[in-house]
Regions:
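Conserved nucleotide-sensing/catalytic segment adjacent to the nucleotide-binding pocket
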Residues: 83-86, 90-146
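Conserved lysine of the Walker
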Residues: 62
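Walker A (P-loop) phosphate-binding loop of P-loop NTPases
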Residues: 59
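Pre-Walker A adenine-sensing motif
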Residues: 33-45
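Hydrophobic positions on the alpha1 helix immediately C-terminal to the Walker A/P-loop
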Residues: 65
Length: 223
């Protein structure tokens, strides 16, 4: 993390790809620090684990942002300890996707062609594990291995007091998915320009990533 007068540059490996992000001082001091301190107060008042859901489309920079928040909390004496986890570990296994089909626009196609869509996640398993996290249990958490193209279970041990969970569909208003917010103490929805998202996803597939500059306008809704 390199600090300048008006911004902070931050580099981190996300799924094996080096990401270079730039966050303005206005965003850090006006949004990020106040959010972390609010969550800290909430955790202390409730005297239990606090679970926060961060939802955003692919390419919005949510993994990088939460990594930055985790780092920021470590350096802020007024913030509690933060632990970041993601929902990618709940992808269905490749063998499952290969053996099943789905109807799209009247055509039956293999589920592998829509990998990453809501129905290609194990929602039941995610719900069960989220229930454990929300209850304050110390539990294992899976991650997605992009080399294996499969999830690996219990790579992370969830034991933090303030847990930030990021994912594409955590606030999706569809059966089953909409129940997830009931486990959360706080939710954040991040929106971003569609053209920017397309550029980033193209770069991601090429093994590159454009520097990210988060602005206040990216934060649309928090409850």
């Amino acid at each position: 993390m390199v600090e300048q007068k008006d911004y902070v540059s931050y580099s981190v490996l996300i799924n094996g790809i080096e990401v270079n992000a730039v966050y303005s001082r206005d965003s850090i001091d006006g949004i990020f620090r106040p959010l972390l301190r609010r969550l800290t107060r909430m955790q202390r008042e409730k005297n239990r684990r606090v679970l926060v859901l961060f939802a955003a489309p692919p390419g919005a920079g949510k993994s990088t942002l939460l990594s930055f928040l985790e780092r920021l909390a470590e350096e802020d004496e007024h913030s509690g300890e933060v632990q970041v986890i993601g929902m990618d570990g709940f992808h269905r296994r490749q063998a499952y996707l290969v053996s099943r089909t789905v109807i799209r626009d009247g055509e039956e196609i293999p589920m592998t062609r829509i990998k990453g869509a809501p129905e290609t996640f194990d929602l039941e398993k995610l719900t069960e594990r989220l229930q454990m996290v929300a209850a304050g249990e110390r539990c294992g958490w899976p991650v997605y291995d992009r080399r294996l193209h499969d999830p690996v279970d219990n790579v992370i041990t969830v034991d933090g007091d303030i847990v930030l969970l990021e994912g594409n569909y955590l606030l999706l208003d569809e059966p089953g998915w909409r129940d997830l917010r009931g486990f959360a103490d706080y939710t954040v929805l991040i929106r971003a320009d569609e053209d920017m998202l397309r550029r980033r996803l193209t770069d991601r597939k090429a093994g590159a990533w454009r520097p990210v500059r988060k602005r206040k306008s990216s934060w649309i809704s928090a409850t």
